Amino acid sequence: LGDYCRYSSSLEPLLSEFAICLIARIWGSGYEWKVHSKIAIDAGVNEDMIESISLGKKPSHMSDEQHAVYEFTMTLNRDRKISDELYNKTYEILGKDRIVDLVGILGYYTLISMTISISISTVPRVTCSPRMALQAIPIHPKKDICTFFPSKADCVI
């Protein structure tokens, strides 16, 4: 499933990585953010958009396709459903195959974010300002697991 989502999806990398960054931000997954924000930029996502996502803000100057991915992703995660109106708007822009692949990508990377949060359950939980999402560092020397490493001024422990 992961290989399909990353390499064979009908969504071009610019859109799939944009969606993955949204999921990483929604879940506060430092590892996913660190890896996929860089891949997204390499795939053509504007750095200002990545910065906006990291701050929990809606990016400006999105293409119609990026806007469709953003609205679909944020609505599905917030409301746990998509209205007929939003589905139809998204369908007009992305089409059925890309909507199906978008839902698969969102589900898969939500699973990854959940798994990572369980994997680091022995690490004290820290709640930080959104800007800190950009500062993920390794926390386990033998595993590729990262967490946020903010300053004390930005955190509640």
Question: What are these regions, as identified by a protein language model?
Answer:
Residues L1-I157:
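Hydrophobic alpha-helical segments
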